[in-house]
């Protein structure tokens, strides 16, 4: 398992389910 950097763009985050939670937090939408 390799650590992945999630995209900062929300539309891209939604496509990356493996990192969705992290992306949401990075984008300021944690919760």
From Swiss-Prot:
Record-linked CDD domains: PlantTI (cd00150)
Site (Reactive bond): 8-9
Cellular component, GO annotation: extracellular region
UniProt xrefs under InterPro entries: Prot_inh_squash (IPR000737), Proteinase_amylase_inhib_sf (IPR011052)
Keyword Glycosyltransferase: no
Pfam family, one: Squash
Subcellular location, record wording: Secreted
GO molecular function: serine-type endopeptidase inhibitor activity
Disulfide bonds listed in the record: 6-23, 13-25, 19-30
Protein function: Inhibits elastase.
Family label: Belongs to the protease inhibitor I7 (squash-type serine protease inhibitor) family.
Domain writeup: The presence of a 'disulfide through disulfide knot' structurally defines this protein as a knottin.
The protein, known as: Elastase inhibitor 4
Species whose genome carries this gene: Momordica charantia
Lineage, highest ranks first: Eukaryota, Viridiplantae, Streptophyta, Embryophyta, Tracheophyta
